Amino acid sequence: MKRACDFHVGDSFELVREADRYRPIYYAAVSGDFNPIHIDREVGRAAGFPDAILQGMCTMAWLADACTAYLEDPARVRRLRVRFSRPVVVGDVVTFRGRCVAVEGPVIRLEVEARNQRGEDVLKGASAEGWVEDLA
């Protein structure tokens, strides 16, 4: 597992996730968010979307997955900040691209962008803070 000295400003990482037909249903089952706009195509269309939309917290969980993969341990993720800018629609493919912007002792600061396959931002101002202690 990486130590704090192994993280460098400019490091980059990427994670790609697809919002398949079942993703909002699976997420509803574990979160309890059964709002029909997330699981019923016709409700999504009635709301002006081409299909059902993914729960925002599922998109945020994917952001956490991207940061966790880079930091190599979920316990290292200390803070996530995000603003939702566009719903993720069933069928969308979201690419999370992040980079390390600061290493200050044990604190690792990350900035992440998330875009769908049309190049549209689905998150704005996404950032994370990791804590990596070098225990001998």
Describe the function of each predicted region.
Residues M1-S12, V88-A136:
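HotDog/MaoC-like acyl-thioester-processing domains
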Residues G32-D33, G44, R78-R79, F96, ...:
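Short, charged/polar low-complexity linear motifs in solvent-exposed/disordered segments
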Residues C67-F96:
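Mid-chain, well-packed structural core segment of small domains
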Residues M1-R76:
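Hot-dog-fold acyl-thioester-processing enzymes
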Residues A28, R83, E129-W131:
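Residues in well-ordered beta-strands of folded domains
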